[in-house]
């Protein structure tokens, strides 16, 4: 090709950054304080709460149970440390409660999945529905792809009975999915399956082994342990000290262990002092933004989003622990 015309490069005009560093920092702190104030005003000393019962969104509360759960769900504390040989008192107590609960739930789940006459989804408890949803939608569809979403027929009567009408059990739904070839048996291992019964047995065996080591399933278990009060707020807050998330305060720590320090009051005090931030707890609301401009010139003086993050730790080799938090 021929060059029609060419212009030699030259230096362009100067570019000036109008952001005011101090104003940027102040705006970020102001957003954090404002969010903390909103969370504190809505925080309620109840473990479980259904916001759909409220007629107006302005009356919606934040159950403190959600705050306790956020320590585990958002990995502020590390649940993997609970079962170590050097675990501290609160960690040990929580782990013992958890292991017993997990064994009971896995046993009940497997019993229902093996039972052709298991209750319909709509007749299950709220907690058991959450486990069934996790198994079907999260584990089998999204995580493993064993249940192939692109093969499922949305207008199929049995699909509607499961997903919309909720009139059948997961046992019946999965067996039907096998008959319709919605199950990818290659994901179950190297075994050859000659019948629908063998495929279903393979699915159950896979589920049982997967759930034993599934940290996301463990988080769901902890959520309901906290909602029921089986794992207490005092135990969770004590673990914050045991794992060094906050500097050890012997008086407060021992008070949490022996019940003299109330976990709800503790959470409120840490939010008020911003030792715990809205961004860490990730309760609603937990994010905000602000743009400050000079009204005379239109220059942007501050442009802030909360919570902020260090993009250097999320590029090239990603810092996964930082990403999760």
At which residue positions do the language-model features occur?
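Periplasmic/cell-envelope proteins involved in peptidoglycan metabolism and beta-lactam response
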Residues: 1-325
